[in-house]
Each structure stands twice: as structure tokens, then as C-alpha cells.
Curated annotation (Swiss-Prot):
One of its GO terms (cellular component) is ribonucleoprotein complex. The keyword rRNA-binding applies. Binds to the 23S rRNA. InterPro entries: Ribosomal_bL9, Ribosomal_bL9/RNase_H1_N, Ribosomal_bL9_bac/chp, Ribosomal_bL9_C, Ribosomal_bL9_C_sf, Ribosomal_bL9_N, Ribosomal_bL9_N_sf. Belongs to the bacterial ribosomal protein bL9 family. The keyword rRNA-binding applies. Pfam families: Ribosomal_L9_C, Ribosomal_L9_N. This is Large ribosomal subunit protein bL9. GO terms for biological process: translation. It comes from the Bacteria. GO terms for molecular function: rRNA binding; structural constituent of ribosome. Keywords: Ribonucleoprotein, Ribosomal protein, RNA-binding, rRNA-binding.
Amino acid sequence: MKLILTQEVTGLGAPGDVVEVKDGYGRNYLVPRGLAMRWTRGGEKTVDSIKAARASRAVRDHDHAEQIKTKLEAQPVAVKVRAGAGGRLFGAVTVTEIAGALADASGEQVDKRTIVVTNPIKSLGAHEVSVKLHDEVSAVVALNVIPA
């Protein structure tokens, strides 16, 4: 099934990309959630308009992403969590908690889907997470997990 992506889909593409996916994935997941629309000959105009809008935002977004990166990397971010004896956490620190802590510390709203945690954070102390702000800009944020 040929689709036009209307939003970024991890591992598949960016808005405006024409992709070929299995029928069930397109029909049951991508299209109902508004992540893609069916490809038609008239849809080529939609692709062109999406790509033109994306190109015009690219330079502005890159500069803005650099500014946010500077803010995020300037200071460590503290996340308060419940912990047991020995510094072991009850569960793991989620990307939602990290996004909230980043918003509190820097004043910038960061989408939780852009936060990349390589290993689950299950202990107190210093950790690092990366935030993909733009195709070419990633920020490595120092995260300090402290007991609540």
C-alpha cells in the first residue's frame, strides 16, 4: 500500500514522504491515527505543499533547535522519584517524567517522543539522555535522579 506521511513516523519517514507499507499497517494503524493518507495522483500536489512548507521551516527550526540545545545542556536536570533502600527505584524513570523535568528546568516544552533513553533508568544518581530536537541537532542532557 502506498501512503503519504502527514506526520513523522519513527523508522518510516518524515511528513511528505511517499512510503510503501503492508496493507494492514497502513489501513489499521497509520491512516486511522492521521499519520498518513492514501497516495493518489492528486495527492502529489499535497506532497509538494507539505515538502515546501517543511523546507521553509527547516532553517528557522534549525536555529531554534540550536538555541534550545544550548538551554538544555547548560545545566543538569533534577528528576525526583520514589526510591527504596539502597537507591533502587520503584519502576523506572519514564520519558514523560523527563519531559516534565526538562520543561521545569529550561522553560522549553520538549515532546516526549524526541527523548531517547538508551538504558532504562532504575537507580539514583547521574544519567545522560539525548533529545533529538531536529534532524541535525541532538542535545545530550545531564539528568540527576534524586529521591523524593
